[in-house]
Design a protein with these regions (language model features):
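Acidic catalytic/metal-coordinating carboxylates
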Residues: 35-36, 61-68, 86
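Receiver (REC) domain active-site loop signature in two-component systems and cognate sites
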Residues: 58
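Short amphipathic alpha-helix used as the core "switch/output" element in two-component signaling
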Residues: 42, 64-75, 93, 97
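Two-component/phosphorelay signaling modules centered on CheY-like receiver
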Residues: 2-5, 13-32, 72
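Active-site beta3 strand of CheY-like receiver
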Residues: 8, 47-53
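C-terminal output helix
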Residues: 87-89, 103, 107-117
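Active-site residues of response regulator receiver
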Residues: 55, 83
Length: 141
C-alpha cells in the first residue's frame, strides 16, 4: 500500500497560500495550508512522504528559520522556497541547508509543480532507505 504524499504550504500572504493550495489540489495532491511558521509547528510530524512549500519572509519565524528548526528537530521533509524578495546569498543559504528549490514570485505553475515532484521523489527515496536500513538492523541484531 502506497501512502499519498502530503504538501504543506506555509505563507503569510493569504491570496498566495490559497492560490498554491488550489493549484496543488487540482494537480491531485493532498495539501494543507498554514498562515505562519508558528501554525505549522503546532502540527504533528507527518509519517509519510511529502514536502513543505515555504515563503522566505514571514512575520515572526521566517521561512529560513523554520527550515533550520525543522532540521534541528529531525524532520527530513524537503523544502521548496517561494519568495518575492530573494537574492543570491539567501538562495545559496537555503540550498546549503537542504532546500530542493528556490522560486521567485511570480513563478509559473509548471516550475512549482516540478520542484514539488522532485521534493516528493527525494522524500520517498529517503523514507525507503530508512525502512531498508531498519529492516537490516532488525535482521542482524
Amino acid at each position: 500500500m502506497t501512502v499519498e504524499p502530503m504538501v504543506f504550504v506555509v505563507d503569510d500572504d493569504r491570496s498566495v497560500r490559497r492560490s498554491v493550495v488550489r493549484l496543488l489540489e487540482t494537480a491531485g495532491l493532498l495539501v494543507e495550508g498554514f498562515p505562519s511558521a508558528e501554525a505549522f509547528l503546532e502540527r504533528e510530524r507527518p509519517d509519510g512522504p511529502g514536502c513543505v512549500v515555504l515563503d522566505v519572509r514571514m512575520p515572526g519565524i521566517s521561512g529560513l528559520e523554520l527550515q533550520r528548526r525543522l532540521t534541528a528537530a529531525g524532520w527530513s521533509t524537503p523544502v521548496v522556497f517561494i519568495t518575492g524578495h530573494g537574492d543570491v546569498p539567501m538562495s545559496v543559504e537555503a540550498m546549503k541547508d537542504g532546500a530542493v528549490d528556490f522560486l521567485l514570485k511570480p513563478f509559473d505553475d509548471e516550475s512549482l509543480l516540478a520542484a514539488i515532484d522532485r521534493a516528493i521523489a527525494r522524500d520517498r527515496a529517503l523514507l525507503r532507505d530508512r525502512l531498508q536500513l531498519e529492516e537490516l538492523r532488525v535482521r542482524y541484531d
